[in-house]
Amino acid sequence: CGFLGMLHLEIITERLKREFNLNLIITAPSIAYEITWHNGKTEHIYAPSRFPDHGASATIREPWVRVQIILPPDYLGSTMTLLHDHEGEIIDTETFSDERTILTILMPLRELMRNFFDQLKNATSGYASLSYEMSDMRPADVERLDVLVAGELVPAFSRVIGTRRVELEAQQVVEKLHSILPRQMFVTKIQASALGRIISSRSISALKKD
């Protein structure tokens, strides 16, 4: 999406508002997944709502990126941990001084967009720099996570995530909505669904009658 972290996004957004008097609506970036259906038809899908259901007969591929990180060697350990969490594959390591190491990594674009740069800055105390370029398309191990409020699907909350993060993200989104949605006159159930089942669920208690 062109921004190196949330701070960069906020700075550019504020400048556009102040200097050009623009009213901006900021939305999450989307990724084009390549879906090949059982009948041989191939299409690129951006909207999570159009993503295949769990168990559907379809082959899914996603874009990967080639990432280059320059950082002090002292932060290699924390960076390796971060890369593992973001499905990064280190393909080359080069040390060109006592103070700088270059890592070349391949990783899914969706993981780069999952706040990777901000987390990298935190892991390296701000010393790391990052650049990336598009690489290729690869088979994707992903699922669609849906959110239901009071038994109704809310398409705006649907997202495509790595299968290994399904349970964690399901719990996080349910807890977040539970903390911000207002109470009603009736009990409101919040559910996160993926892998063909309800992964996480919480209920907002009803308002007490006077």
Where are these regions (language model features)?
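Accessory interaction regions appended to the cores of large information-processing enzymes
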Residues: 1-210
